[in-house]
């Protein structure tokens, strides 16, 4: 159950009650594609860096180790040793982005594994069964994420099919949650809004899927090539057409600036690989912008990545030492940068929630953007 605690403008301060605990929103979900966050981050680290939700990938876990294996081992929570909420995406994005040759039919998608090339079929029912085997807290509906360069006619057909698939996802989820051997009989289902950069298609789709009374709603198919201004324009158009009393999830986004702008538009769930991916390459976030620790100017810098930061890296090590580890290709350097970045993101979400509680999100946002050397583009 989602509890809308208060609003500050369009920004939502919420709380999602789940079988695996309460999620305070707005929240950034830490991405662990194959049931682990890249960068040698263990689930035992997640508590220390303020993680509320871990996100894993249905497609990757279906291919390896196999969702049946995970089910036999008690589900993802037991498999990973993580007792807080987990969201699994449906596999749709990976099917349409990673897979080479694929055939889209009404029943689903036929494609080849990116690992060994073997043939796989995935449709709405298959995606729900896989996610039920994984026993995640929140399952995402199976959708088509069309190319950012697809024409309007194709987008319209794709969105209509995604709507039909969503109805099938809901029916299958209800069936699975009633089975005696299902691990998580309270698995939630989020639907996904699509429509490319076409506002009218997006709005019509949002209105249609809102009638299905799902546990939450996501905006998908953004951050796939369009400009930030286009993304914000779409959010301005579509978010008001999604239920206010349900979580609103912007998939795969994004930078700290993206998150601040999207919160201002009513979004309260986020995920993105940026903090871990950038960390693995020595790029770290601070309240004054991003640093590249490979830069020679940090060779003798004995300060932490950010003064006052309480992450494991900043409490114990200097920029100079972490730079040395990165240059020496020691895994510890990568790990420390990833831990710092995730802590930075999770702390920023904590600050956002505090600002919403206090009713001063607008001033917090402007100050945060100013310190990071950015400016608001709320009114693009």
Region locations from a protein language model:
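Short, solvent-exposed loop/turn segments at secondary-structure junctions
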Residues: 30, 60-62, 93-94, 146-147, ...
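Glycine-rich phosphate/ribose-binding loops and adjacent secondary-structure elements
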Residues: 163, 172, 176, 184, ...
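Non-catalytic, usually N-terminal nucleic-acid engagement modules in DNA/RNA processing proteins
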Residues: 1-183, 296-299
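Conserved, mostly hydrophobic/aromatic
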Residues: 21, 54, 89, 131, ...
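Glycine- and acidic
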Residues: 147-151, 156, 216-222, 331-334
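Short, basic, low-complexity termini and linkers enriched in Ser/Thr/Gly/Pro
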Residues: 178-185, 374-380
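A non-catalytic, amphipathic alpha-helix used as a structural packing/dimerization or gating element
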Residues: 126, 130, 157-168, 204, ...
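C-terminal extensions of enzymes
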Residues: 1-15, 23-32, 39-40, 143-149, ...
